[in-house]
Amino acid sequence: MAQLEVDLVDTDGTIWSGEARQVSAPASDGEIGILAGHTPVLSVLRHGEVRVIEAGGTVHRWTVEGGFLSVDADQVTVVVDAAEAVASGTSAR
C-alpha cells in the first residue's frame, strides 16, 4: 500500500514526521481525510483533532487550535498554531 509522507509542525518546530497510511484533520468546512493518491489540496483548519495512522496501525492524535493542511504528491504538511498530544500508540481497527 502506498504511503503518505507527513510533517506536523507548529511555531516551535516539528511535532511529528514520518510515513502514514491516513491523515484526518478538522478542516474549516468539515473533517478531511487524506489517503495516498489524494488530489492536491490546501485547507484551513479549525479547532479539533488531527489524527495520523501509521501503516502498522499505530494512531497518533493531537488537539489543534487551527492552522492549515497542504497535500501534494503524497506529501502532507500540517501547520498548526498550537497542538497538544491526546494519545499515542493506540491501534487503529
What are these regions (language model features)?
Residues M1-A2:
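N-terminal helix initiation/capping motif
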Residues E5-R93:
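Compact, glycine-rich, soluble single-domain proteins
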